[in-house]
A protein has these predicted regions:
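His/Asp/Glu-rich metal-coordinating catalytic cores
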Residues: 1-137, 141-155, 176-179
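Short, compositionally biased "basic patch" segments
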Residues: 74-93, 174-180, 250-276
C-alpha cells in the first residue's frame, strides 16, 4: 500500500497557520521581500503575485502570474494588468492554442436551447460541474435566463456538498464581482437567490433525486471520475429522455472524456451502462486564458522584462508561447527546466560550472543545477498509474466485444 505523505492532523496544523491577505496591500513575508497580490481573474480570489526583492542594496521586481483567466468571464472581474517588472514568470496552459470565441449571448442562448430540447423529452438534465467556479458560473447564467423567462421554472438541484460550501463563500465577497454580476445581484436580491435553486445536503436527499423527472442536477466531479455525479450517471445515462451537458474540459482517460466523445457504453461502479441520453457540450466557461488571452494580458507590459520564464504548461505549449514572445514581442523568453536556478541579481543561470562574471554579451552562466535529480521525479508512481489506466482504456476501446476485452485483461493480469 502507498503511505500518505500527510494526514488529517498535518492538514489541520497547516490550515491553522493560514492568514488572509488583502489584494493591493503589500506585506513582508521575510526581510527584504515585499509581496502584493493582484486579481488574476481565474477563479474567485485568485491572484498573481508581485514580489520586490532587495539584496546588496539592489531591488528586483518579479511577477508570478499563476493561472490567468479570460476577460469577460462570468461573475468575477477581469484580470488586472501590470506594466513593469524586471522578471516575469508566466503560465502557458493554453500557450499553443486558441479556443473559438463564445460570447456571453451565445453561451446563454445555447443553454436556453439545450434546456428547451431536454424539457420536451421530459427527462432529467445532468450537468457534471466542478465545485469551484463552474457551478457558480452556471447558476449565475441560469438565473439570468430565468429572469428573462428564457427557460422555464424547472427545478435546479446542486448535489455537491463542496459546491454548496463554495457558493456560500461567493456570497461573502461581492467586491470581487464584475459589473454584470453586481447588477444581477441588485436586481434579484442575490446572485444565487431563486426559488428554483436547491442545494442537497445528505446522501438520502441525493438518492431521492432519482425519483424525480423534469429536473436539473448539477454535481461533481466535473470530469465524472468521482463524487455523486457517478451515481447520477449510472441511474440516468441509459435513458434517451435524459440529457447530459458537459461544460468543462474532459481530460484524456476520464469517464467524462469517454462519454463526451461518443462512447456507446461505459463502465460505472463495475457495471456496463449504455449511453442512451443526449450528450451536449456548452463552451465559454474556461477559467484559463488561451494563447490570445495570454498575449492580451502581456500587451499591458510597457517595457520587456529582462527575462520572461514561460512555465506551467505542457512542453509544446510553453515552447510555443516562448517562441511567440521572442519573435513578435522581442521578449527574452525561456522555458526553464525543473531543478534549474537563476541568479536574478546578476541574471545568470545556475548549472554545473563555476560562476563567471556576466558581461552584456553572455545570456546565462551555469553555476549549479539539480535538474538530473529532479528529472527522475517528473514521472512518479501516480503519473505512471494514470498512464497505465489511459492505455488500458484505449486497449478496451479497440476490442470488438466483451470476450476480447476479457482475454486482453487476463493477459495483463498474467504478466503481473
Amino acid at each position: 500500500p502507498v503511505s500518505p505523505i500527510y494526514d488529517e492532523i498535518d492538514a489541520d496544523n497547516a490550515i491553522s497557520l493560514l492568514r488572509g491577505i488583502e489584494r493591493y496591500r503589500a506585506f513582508a513575508p521575510a526581510k527584504n521581500i515585499d509581496v502584493t497580490f493582484h486579481n488574476a481573474g481565474h477563479v474567485l480570489g485568485s491572484s498573481f503575485i508581485e514580489i520586490n526583492i532587495t539584496e546588496n542594496g539592489e531591488t528586483r521586481k518579479l511577477v508570478f502570474s499563476g493561472d490567468l483567466g479570460e476577460d469577460d468571464h462570468p461573475i468575477i472581474n477581469d484580470p488586472d494588468r501590470i506594466k513593469k517588472m524586471d522578471f516575469l514568470v508566466v503560465e502557458s496552459t493554453y500557450g499553443d492554442r486558441n479556443r473559438d470565441i463564445v460570447t456571453k449571448e451565445q453561451r446563454l442562448n445555447k443553454i436556453a436551447e439545450v434546456f428547451a430540447g431536454a424539457e420536451k423529452r421530459g427527462g432529467k438534465i445532468i450537468i457534471p460541474a466542478f465545485s469551484l467556479e463552474r457551478t457558480q458560473d452556471l447558476l449565475h447564467d441560469i438565473l439570468i435566463l430565468k429572469k428573462k423567462n428564457k427557460i422555464s421554472r424547472i427545478p435546479i438541484y446542486v448535489d455537491s456538498p463542496l459546491a454548496k460550501e463554495i457558493t456560500q463563500v461567493f456570497l461573502k465577497y461581492p467586491n470581487c464581482y464584475d459589473e454584470d454580476a453586481t447588477n444581477v445581484m441588485k436586481q434579484m436580491g442575490g446572485l444565487f437567490d431563486h426559488p428554483d435553486f436547491h442545494f442537497t445536503n445528505s446522501v438520502d436527499e441525493s438518492k431521492l433525486l432519482n425519483e424525480k423527472d423534469n429536473i436539473v442536477i448539477m454535481s461533481a466531479s466535473g470530469m465524472c471520475d468521482a463524487g455523486r455525479i457517478k451515481h447520477h450517471l449510472k441511474h440516468n445515462l441509459w435513458d434517451p429522455k435524459n440529457t447530459v451537458i458537459f461544460v468543462g474540459y474532459q481530460a484524456e482517460g476520464t469517464l467524462g472524456r469517454l462519454i463526451s466523445e461518443g462512447a456507446k457504453k461505459v463502465r460505472i461502479f463495475g457495471e456496463e451502462i449504455s449511453v442512451g441520453a443526449k450528450i451536449e457540450s456548452i463552451y465559454g466557461y474556461s477559467g484559463h486564458a488561451d494563447q490570445n488571452g495570454l498575449l492580451k494580458w502581456l500587451d499591458a507590459i510597457e517595457e520587456a522584462p529582462r527575462c520572461t520564464f514561460v512555465t506551467h504548461g505542457e512542453p509544446e505549449s510553453s515552447e510555443a508561447l516562448a517562441s511567440l514572445l521572442k519573435k513578435n514581442r522581442e521578449f527574452k523568453a525561456i522555458t526553464p527546466k525543473m531543478g534549474e536556478e537563476y541568479d536574478l541579481l546578476s541574471f545568470v543561470k545556475v548549472g554545473d560550472v563555476e560562476l563567471k562574471k556576466k558581461n552584456d554579451d553572455v545570456k546565462y552562466v551555469l553555476v549549479r543545477s539539480t535538474a538530473p535529480a529532479y528529472a527522475s521525479l517528473v514521472r512518479d508512481s501516480h503519473n505512471l498509474k494514470a498512464e497505465l489506466l489511459i492505455k488500458i482504456n484505449e486497449l478496451m476501446e479497440n476490442c470488438k466485444d466483451e470476450s476480447e476485452r476479457c482475454a486482453k485483461l487476463q493477459n495483463l493480469l498474467n504478466l503481473l
